[in-house]
Amino acid sequence: MPTSRNDDMMVFCSFCGKNQDEVQKIIAGNNAFICNECVELAQEIIREELAEEVLADLSEVPKPQELLNILNHYVIGQDRAKRALAVAVYNHYKRINYHDSREEEDVELQKSNILMIGPTGSGKTFLAQTLARSLNVPFAIADATALTEAGYVGEDVENILLKLLQAADFNIERAERGIIYVDEIDKIAKKGENVSITRDVSGEGVQQALLKIIEGTVASVPPQGGRKHPQQEMIQVDTKNILFIVGGAFDGIEEIVKQRLGEKIIGFGQNNRAIDEDSSYMQEIISEDVQKFGIIPELIGRLPVFAALEQLTVDDLVRILKEPRNALIKQYQALLSYDDVKLEFDEDALQEIANKAIERKTGARGLRSIIEETMMDVMFEVPSQENVKLVRITKEAVDGTDKPILETA
């Protein structure tokens, strides 16, 4: 309802002293008022202070050896890959600190994103997650197979940045220094010539779209997620300091490496390496091999750090079950301890779990599901049996020929 303007009704901002006629809006609080201009100024001050906090957080980046030690607490094996990642991550955040303090005429350091190549279940995603957690930076995972070119059904590449913003609670400054892991990059390898008359909407086109944000650009990110809200106000995100780790299994790339090295397999010749040594070729991969696989050279050029992961062995998988701080065996022991029940695994039971994971070609990723299958009845029945004090998992319990052993008080 309109009111007349006079001195008795004039409202003034408690911070800057301007009256309601001099600003667009005045908000009333508990015995105080604030105008829209002071709100905007306060937001700017908070943004600057948060940005300074982000810079301070990253000013003392753990050295490569310290990062490696952290990774060793959680990740078994893959020593060469862990060293490569530790050096690359350290150099990345050192580069950010250098650019924040450098003079105009100083050398400009280019960003070194990372390409991880390794079989399913070898630990690619877990390595990236562990690095981000150890640095306390926002982290997002994207599946390359869900991405399509703009104008086609599917996710735009900008949605990857939205996930990072969400992980940073929409703190843009923190998001701009985060880590993004793009999985299944090998599944969008460029198709060969004349393979199909249809457009390759999830292959080379997506690689080109990824290239733009990986190399560094100011991207317009839809806060509500893409195409359903075309009128929404975009958030501007600068990707020049975001570390991109791109991973994939690259099944069959060993053959490309063998051909390049002149060791093409023909029959069962004496000069051929044994099949179980194929993983050694992973350490010989160069950019030429990745390009032949179907990744465009421009994208490869933005991924100068290669980290090759080996196929995990039975011994590796057994160690993964037992040794890390968050080892699966420790997790299930903690679950049963809540019911005052002790859980033990025979050594040959752990070997059987590892063998099953290798047979299923699931690597470390499949260990949990095998334990769940083995312990389903135990976890259902034991909480209701107050006299049970110990559960022992044997090899026979894992292979299904017998049940776990229950010991009562």
Curated annotation (Swiss-Prot):
CDD domains: RecA-like_ClpX. Residues 1-54 form the ClpX-type ZB domain. Keywords: ATP-binding, Chaperone, Metal-binding, Nucleotide-binding, Zinc. The keyword Plastid does not apply. GO terms for biological process: cell division; proteolysis involved in protein catabolic process. One of its GO terms (cellular component) is HslUV protease complex. InterPro entries: AAA+_ATPase, ATP-dep_Clp_protease_ClpX, ATPase_AAA_core, Clp_ATPase_C, Clp_protease_ATP-bd_su_ClpX, ClpX_bact, P-loop_NTPase, Znf_CppX_C4. It comes from the Bacteria. Zn(2+) binds at residues 13, 16, 35, 38. GO terms for molecular function: ATP binding; ATP hydrolysis activity; ATP-dependent protein folding chaperone; protein dimerization activity; unfolded protein binding; zinc ion binding. ATP binds at residues 119-126. HAMAP family: ClpX. ATP-dependent specificity component of the Clp protease. It directs the protease to specific substrates. Can perform chaperone functions in the absence of ClpP. Belongs to the ClpX chaperone family. Component of the ClpX-ClpP complex. Forms a hexameric ring that, in the presence of ATP, binds to fourteen ClpP subunits assembled into a disk-like structure with a central cavity, resembling the structure of eukaryotic proteasomes. This is ATP-dependent Clp protease ATP-binding subunit ClpX. It comes from Streptococcus sanguinis (strain SK36).
